[in-house]
Amino acid sequence: MTMSDPIADMLTRIRNANTAKHDTVDVPASKMKIAIAEILLKEGYIKSFEIEEVGSFKTIHITLKYGKDKNEKVITGLKRISKPGLRVYANSTELPRVLGGLGVAIISTNKGVLTDKAARNANVGGEVLAFIW
């Protein structure tokens, strides 16, 4: 059976692994998911990620990040905004701020997948994929 929302599946896998205090999580790879993982790494929400290829099947191996001990989570919340049944778009002036600027909104634009701050600076809008805080 095919997956109706692979991005929500990725975010759910990360959320579940973070809640269970796992060190790593594996996610089936796609260009969009790799771009989201790059944003998570750049913003400091994950330690690292690498793409592993087994035959023709690629997976993203994500290493999660915690505070001094595993009880301090770096990712406190992940929320999928635009869904297959209800797409959410915003222009550059309407881009949302997550927790007053403390979190990050991931936006899919014509210039690639960007954070809300980068999209505002580039003066582009797009589909609001997810919030991370």
From Swiss-Prot:
Keywords, in A-Z order: Ribonucleoprotein, Ribosomal protein, RNA-binding, rRNA-binding
Family: Belongs to the universal ribosomal protein uS8 family.
GO process terms (BP): translation
GO cellular component terms attached to this protein's record: ribonucleoprotein complex; ribosome
Protein name: Small ribosomal subunit protein uS8
Quaternary structure annotation from Swiss-Prot or TrEMBL: Part of the 30S ribosomal subunit. Contacts proteins S5 and S12.
PANTHER family assigned: 40S RIBOSOMAL PROTEIN S15A
Pfam family, one: Ribosomal_S8
Gene behind this protein: rpsH
Molecular function terms from GO: rRNA binding; structural constituent of ribosome
Task of the protein: One of the primary rRNA binding proteins, it binds directly to 16S rRNA central domain where it helps coordinate assembly of the platform of the 30S subunit.
